[in-house]
Amino acid sequence: RSRGLGDVYKRQDLTQRAIHVQKTIIRKLADRESCVIIGRSADYILKEQKPILRIFIYSPEDVRIQNVMKSHNFSAEDAKMFITEKDKRYHKRHLALTGSNRGDRHNRDMLIDSSLLGVDGTAELIEEVAKKVFHE
């Protein structure tokens, strides 16, 4: 079945509604209590919120490929394709919402390469930084 312009508009409208709902939920959570929000362009949505700690966590491509191979039982080639497609979707969504590139250091307080300390070590580092930033 071919898709007409009506289908395109419906999908765009649905995407915009989903983004609006996400923004509303994220703002309500942040207004209600201290919270950690992973992804969803929350750094942009909460840019006026104070205090805030905006962190971008990344790892080198080879580490990401190994993680996906292990977690999804993919070949290296399939893992790389999976990561590429996922990144494209995330970047496209973030750019449409914010006008900036995902991972842009100018919109972050910290960038952390999680391959240096691993998942637990990265979480511990963030916890320590948050305690200092929020004086806890």
Regions found by a protein language model. Give the residues of each.
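Conserved phosphate-donor/acceptor-positioning beta-strand/loop module used by diverse small-molecule
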Residues: 48-71, 76-86
